[in-house]
């Protein structure tokens, strides 16, 4: 390597990458890169939880206490500074011209005799003016890049916060659900224990009565044993006289002998079926409290008649005189409830009974209510329905609804909505002790959701049965 190349390489190695000047009080982080002490301490930095700061060049974390001034390097810089500033390291002439090809400030000798010979050379003043004009453009490019990365960092920060919030809510939900399970199982344990204690008390009382009776009888037998021994010791005449009396008395006592005591204790059998029933009951106990919904007549299609209690709705052949509200369904025989939800868990039940055609579920605030409805999750509809009284369907993204396998004919449908879990589940809740899952939609919900009811066309009376929101009287809650 020639001396000029060596000097240029040394100058590069002795230059701070932050201020582009020769090192002043050079320090070297643990990663091995070197900076001016003032440049490094003044650089933007983000400390981690251990107090370490990232290297501006490679982002490797470094502990502040490891930063010591490199005295050897500092002395080398001082020696290098003996070359006059603004002079060529090779020829010691002033740096007076600029090589546009190599983008380098050089001296006149370099331009005429050195490696820059034949290149496009301009004066330093011309280069200064030219590059000065280009600087704003570079600043714009830098600003755009910085803003873009700042937006990316903001998005990442928001995603980190969302992840932390999601995990926090998940942990809270897990804790809440498991606490509810523990509470329910504790109540169930106490109930079964009390039932066992009652059975034990009843059986013990009965057995003690039986034992007392048996004790009295045993006393009579022991007494007769003594009498028989006394008769045995008598002379002939006295023996015969007493024996007949004693024998008759003994036969009477033996004839009145109480049957042996036996008592069956009736306790719950801890079988697989029992466990299954407990889990079913616990599942129902863990569901949110039943929502007390009411139909919203302002959203009902013209043929629908909402009963005065707000809990029943049916389809009539006659159109009602109603105003054309923006949120009213105009073609499909549908309506929503007055209540709507934006968060949390919710559960409500609808009596369909023997109605042969219906659809239930939730719709988004932005779902279309005019004209023909295209019921699918992508259009803001999460529904299941029944047709012909026997075909049950889930309105998925498929071209045709998904046919569900349903046992029997559900008379009451339970609908469970969880914003945090992104779930809409449908249950056959006809039997409270035997709730059966029909179908579940999994979705990431945003915005407001409305409980939805499609009464369907009355079909000349064949489908005139009403839909009813189920909510028991207060004394049954």
UniProtKB/Swiss-Prot annotation:
Zn(2+) 3 binds at residues 86, 89, 105, 108. Residues 135-232 form a coiled coil. The keyword Coiled coil applies. Zn(2+) 4 binds at residues 97, 100, 114, 117. Residues 272-476 form the B30.2/SPRY domain. InterPro entries: B30.2/SPRY, B30.2/SPRY_sf, Butyrophylin_SPRY, ConA-like_dom_sf, PRY, SPRY_dom, TRIM/RBCC, Znf-RING_euk. Keywords: Cell membrane, Coiled coil, Cytoplasmic vesicle, Disulfide bond, Exocytosis, Membrane, Metal-binding, Transferase, Transport, Ubl conjugation pathway, Zinc, Zinc-finger. It is an enzyme of class 2 (transferase). Its EC number is 2.3.2.27. Belongs to the TRIM/RBCC family. Homodimer. Homooligomer; disulfide-linked. Oligomerizes on the phospholipid membrane. The RING domain is flexible in both the dimer and oligomer. Binding to the negatively charged phosphatidylserine lipids is mediated by the positively charged PRYSPRY domains and is inhibited by Ca(2+). This is Tripartite motif-containing protein 72.
């Amino acid at each position: 390597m020639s001396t000029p190349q060596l000097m240029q390489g040394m100058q590069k190695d002795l230059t701070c990458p932050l201020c582009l000047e020769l090192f002043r009080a050079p320090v070297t982080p643990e990663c091995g890169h070197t900076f001016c002490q003032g440049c490094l301490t003044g650089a933007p930095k983000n400390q981690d939880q251990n107090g370490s700061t990232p290297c501006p060049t490679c982002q490797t974390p470094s502990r502040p206490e490891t930063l010591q001034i490199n005295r050897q390097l500092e002395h080398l810089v001082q020696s290098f500074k003996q070359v006059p500033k603004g002079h060529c390291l090779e020829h010691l002439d002033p740096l007076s011209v600029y090589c546009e090809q190599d983008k380098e400030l050089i001296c006149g000798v370099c331009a005429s005799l050195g490696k820059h010979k034949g290149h496009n050379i301009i004066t330093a003043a011309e280069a200064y003016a030219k590059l000065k004009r280009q600087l704003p453009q570079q600043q714009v490019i830098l600003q755009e890049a910085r803003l873009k990365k700042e937006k990316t960092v903001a998005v990442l920060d928001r995603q980190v916060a969302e992840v932390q919030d999601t995990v926090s809510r998940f942990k809270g939900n897990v804790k809440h659900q498991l606490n509810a399970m523990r509470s329910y199982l504790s109540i169930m344990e106490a109930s079964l224990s009390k039932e066992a204690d009652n059975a034990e008390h009843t059986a013990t009382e009965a057995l003690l009565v039986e034992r007392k009776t048996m004790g009295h009888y045993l006393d009579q037998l022991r007494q007769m044993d003594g009498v028989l021994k006394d008769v045995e010791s008598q002379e002939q005449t006295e023996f015969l006289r007493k024996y007949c009396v004693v024998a008759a008395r003994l036969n009477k006592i033996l004839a009145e002998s109480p049957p042996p005591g036996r008592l069956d204790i009736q306790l719950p059998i801890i079988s697989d079926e029992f466990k299954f029933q407990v889990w079913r009951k616990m599942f129902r106990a863990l569901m949110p409290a039943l929502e007390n919904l009411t139909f919203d007549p302002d959203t009902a299609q013209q043929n629908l008649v909402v009963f005065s209690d707000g809990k029943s709705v049916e389809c009539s052949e006659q159109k009602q005189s109603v105003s054309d509200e923006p949120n009213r369904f105009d073609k499909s025989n549908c309506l929503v409830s007055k209540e709507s939800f934006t968060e949390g868990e919710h559960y409500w039940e609808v009596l369909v009974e023997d109605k042969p055609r219906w659809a239930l579920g939730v719709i988004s605030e932005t779902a279309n209510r005019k004209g023909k409805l295209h019921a699918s999750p992508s259009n803001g509809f999460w529904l299941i329905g029944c047709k012909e009284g026997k075909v049950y369907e889930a309105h998925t993204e498929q071209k045709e609804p998904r046919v569900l396998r349903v046992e029997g004919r559900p008379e009451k449908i339970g609908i469970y909505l969880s914003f945090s879990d992104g779930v809409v589940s449908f249950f056959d809740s006809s039997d409270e002790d035997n709730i059966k899952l029909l179908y579940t939609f999994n979705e990431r919900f945003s915005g407001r959701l409305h409980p939805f009811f499609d009464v369907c066309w009355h079909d000349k009376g064949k489908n005139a049965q009403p839909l009813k929101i189920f909510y028991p009287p207060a004394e049954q809650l």
